[in-house]
């Protein structure tokens, strides 16, 4: 793939964001699945102000695809790459601030780190996220969590940025959500930060819950081979009828099934692992 971005766009990005911009980036280096071709452009903002700039600049070139990403722990990239702009929210947006029983997190805060800091303060309520690799912005976007819970159960408010780079605050009363569904999906809004409500507890109690969750994940989930976690959504209605997706997949004899160098994990059938050199078409 050759660089095909409009000259005017590249000039603006280089001038306004400098070393926060990379070109022709191997997506296999970003994805937990270790799969993907080249991305035309990856912008990694080091502040909310830079994020606003990036969104404003790229919105002027609406003909180009644009995607907001985090740690890419839940994404499958095409072998052909991404012929557009990726805006990657990570360590540059990692402000974490505790205020009594609430915590303010910028979108790039790493989820396990947030859980750890809550434990250190004896704050409970979000232990279920402790083993999820990813950024809090992505977790809020998909109302992610574990043990059939979602992070938006604890939301106080969410700061979002519009396509034009304007910051807005949305209170919990205006955030309808359900299992793995949030109002941010399918809307031209970028999650910039979130404020969460926690509960006073003790470090011992929080530690015990986290250890139980992590021990369960280590026992059940494949960790040695590249993967992107659970592939199929556990639909609450179907769960009552056929059980979790992994059980259903195993029941029809697909556990261990291989295509190319991608395989339905022999440890947990709701995981697809990269045995080495797998392609997106294999997955």
Where are these regions (language model features)?
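Short clusters of hydrophobic/aromatic residues that line enzyme substrate/ligand-binding pockets
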Residues: 21, 27, 33, 93-96, ...
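Contiguous, small/hydrophobic- and glycine-enriched helical/loop subdomains that border
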Residues: 98-102, 106, 111-112, 124-131, ...
